[in-house]
Amino acid sequence: MIRLTARTGRLFLELCSFVGELIIFCFRILTNLLVPPFFLRAFFSSIIQIGWLSLPVVGITSFFTGGALALQIYAGGARFNAEEVVPSIVAIGMVRELGPVLGGLMVAARVASSIAAEIGTMKVTEQVDALITLSTEPIKYLVVPRVIAAVLAVPVLVGVGDSIGVLGGYVIGTTRLDFNNAIYLINSINYLEFWDVLSGLIKGAVFGCIISVMGCFFGMRCEKGARGVGQATKSAVVSASVLILAANYFLTEA
């Protein structure tokens, strides 16, 4: 009983320490966000890495998700003679929920791991210490450009993913489910509201912030050795994915 209590207390203290480190890390990002110098080259490099190079995986995932969603909604709607709801539900479901969440998870798997591994390797090989020696703030040089790039790039990816997902539903709806092309498009557009699109883009910005902060945070606290880099990469992806799902719930409820 005493051992169990001690272990529980130790886990609680470790959790408090972790949360405290994360809060301090976020505060350091905020204090360096708008303070010169601005490393534009690192920023544009991060835009390409996070946005452009993530486009194929987000596009492919969204297309097949939209197609599968159309098939499932049609199968369910056919039981109640409500097949006509397929276009509108596919559009709303992709734009409000599935597009942002799946896009965020795909980017988290690709980008959070990449950021954590890159910064973790720099930490292990003492390149971060070299930046400090050269009077360069590591947060300013390594973290801030990636955070800003992710906050700007992920909503764009979400918007593109939404469009491709709706296109996937359209292709399946018109080729496999015998929907009329014009009617499918009209029903998809008519039931979408501006807030549906805006809420998905807001989620994308929040998810981008989560992905970049988690990747940078675990990379900066990486322990020595290859094992430490692997652990940092795993922790970044898992934490970012869990936080994305949690944030999605609260943003949907708000």
Task: For each feature predicted by the language model, list its residue ranges.
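Short, membrane-interfacial amphipathic segments enriched in basic
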Residues: 1-41, 218-219, 223
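Active-site cofactor/substrate anionic-group-binding motifs, chiefly glycine-
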Residues: 46-102, 106
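Selective transmembrane-helix segments that form parts of the transport pathway or gating/packing helices
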Residues: 51, 55, 59, 98, ...
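Hydrophobic positions within alpha-helical transmembrane segments of bacterial inner-membrane proteins
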Residues: 63, 67, 105, 109-110, ...
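Membrane-interfacial helix-loop-helix connectors in multipass membrane proteins
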Residues: 72-95, 160-205, 209, 213-235, ...
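A hydrophobic alpha-helix feature that marks transmembrane segments and, especially
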Residues: 105-123
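Short cytoplasmic-facing helical segments at TM-TM junctions of multi-pass membrane proteins
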Residues: 119-144, 226-229
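Helical hairpin unit composed of two closely spaced alpha helices linked by a short loop
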Residues: 233-251
